[in-house]
Amino acid sequence: MNKLSNAFSVLAFADEDAPMASSSSTGKQEESVNGSLEDGDYKQPLVWIDLEMTGLNVEVDRILEIACIITNGDLTQSVEGPDLVVRQTKDCLDKMDDWCQTHHGASGLTKKVLLSAITEREAEQKVIEFVKKHVGSGNPLLAGNSVYVDFLFLKKYMPELAALFPHILVDVSSVKALCARWFPIERRKAPAKKNNHRAMDDIRESIKELKYYKKTIFKARR
């Protein structure tokens, strides 16, 4: 869900060493981008979630797709999680605005939604299981692009999943907005996005974008 630009989200820091309410099981190894990690071995974890919806009005619109990737705080390790298309009715899809009709139709998502047998509740439980497995005792922060909108939809339609996260969000859109004002040259060199408007693709692009800002703008400690 990359079409919003959020210049007003507040960036803050939390005690990320505080334990989660529920910890994951341990023992099984999971492959990551940089090798294998024990379950729950992601330090200062970021839980990247992206939703595709029928629109942006949380009171009437519904979730069509949810994807999740977990990284450590340094963005050097990651594991890809569920990438789920959620069943919604044809009547629900017919009420989408022109933008959603066009883009979700072109991406193939609309057709996949009608063929899916996964409910919102089932999708929520699969993502919760994945997050708890890999976060362990860490206190995860929700991350993404304009992720405050995704968080609103999670609170309404997937409240148990939303409850895993504090109010602090790692919003790449906010970082981008600040870089455009303070480091405009570097901002213009940020990786271009394909804007496929599919949840997992959007997360991968968001992580790539934040890695660029980390390397280019947020200098390493001396």
UniProtKB/Swiss-Prot annotation:
Broad enzyme group: hydrolase
Coiled-coil annotated residue ranges, if any: none
Keywords, alphabetical: Exonuclease, Hydrolase, Nuclease
Pfam families cross-referenced by the UniProt entry: RNase_T
Family from the record: Belongs to the oligoribonuclease family.
High-level lineage: Eukaryota, Viridiplantae, Streptophyta, Embryophyta, Tracheophyta
Superkingdom as given in the UniProt entry: Eukaryota
Start and end residues of each stretch annotated as Disordered: 19-38
Compositional bias ranges of the Polar residues kind: 21-35
Protein name as annotated: Oligoribonuclease
GO molecular function annotations of the record: 3'-5'-RNA exonuclease activity; nucleic acid binding
